[in-house]
């Protein structure tokens, strides 16, 4: 169920990392409250930054000294999951879905099966040999190409994932520590040894995922109410040291 419903498509990126994170959270709140339809958003940060999961600690996930030296922000997102390096070459997709319209997403594991099943099929249709690894990763030949995470509410969820298509080699190892909690398939390999970009242009990635979830949708714009909420959250939360270093 779900596919074929009228969904909203947003292909919109802010220059500011805090606003990009804030908009994903705002979309969840708007869908959960019934103020906005189920939404698929694409975005890509023009600036490099580190984003950690909601329950992680900066000191364990990022090389703070390197980030500080290079002016790379370290931010905390609203969802669970592991640390990610954002920036050019990392395409993000975010789905804010109500359980009423997408009952397949009403439980955690079922939602990953549903969403990543469709993403995997869409990427395979582009000629890639993508397979699911662990709960929330996608890989090609044992090399990770996509990480995913969720935030869940009573009646809706936010699922967001990355698709790497051109990240500069060496940056992950410079800014991210090696994760202690990792899927078995990664073994003891470092970031630069287990992460691989997909050899597909970002426009084709966008189109494939759009067809998988909202084939009839045309790009829309962020509403004025959402813009106001983004500004508030970006300032009060995502730009706050209390939030980003809360653990």
Regions found by a protein language model. Give the residues of each.
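Structural motif
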Residues: 69, 140-141
């Amino acid at each position: 169920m779900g596919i074929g419903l009228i969904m909203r498509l947003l292909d919109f990126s802010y220059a500011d990392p805090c606003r990009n994170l804030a908009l994903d959270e705002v979309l969840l709140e708007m869908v959960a409250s019934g103020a906005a339809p189920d939404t698929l958003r694409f975005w890509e940060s023009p600036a490099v930054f580190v984003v950690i999961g909601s329950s992680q600690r900066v000191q364990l996930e990022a090389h703070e000294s390197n980030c500080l030296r290079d002016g790379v922000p370290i931010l905390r997102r609203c969802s669970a999951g592991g640390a990610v390096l954002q920036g050019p070459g990392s395409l993000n997709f975010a789905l804010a879905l109500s359980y009423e319209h997408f009952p397949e997403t009403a439980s955690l594991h079922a939602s990953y099966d549903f969403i990543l099943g469709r993403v995997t099929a869409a990427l395979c249709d582009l000629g890639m040999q993508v397979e699911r690894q662990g709960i929330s990763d996608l890989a090609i030949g044992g090399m990770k190409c996509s990480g995913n995470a969720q935030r869940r509410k009573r009646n809706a969820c936010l699922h967001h994932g990355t698709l790497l298509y051109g990240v500069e080699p060496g940056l992950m190892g410079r800014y991210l520590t090696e994760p202690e909690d990792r899927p078995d398939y990664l073994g003891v390999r470092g970031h630069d040894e287990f992460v691989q970009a997909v050899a597909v242009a970002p426009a084709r990635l966008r189109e494939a995922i759009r067809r998988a979830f909202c084939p009839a949708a045309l790009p829309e714009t962020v509403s004025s109410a959402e813009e106001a909420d983004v500004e508030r959250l970006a300032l009060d939360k995502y730009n706050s040291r209390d939030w980003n270093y809360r653990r």
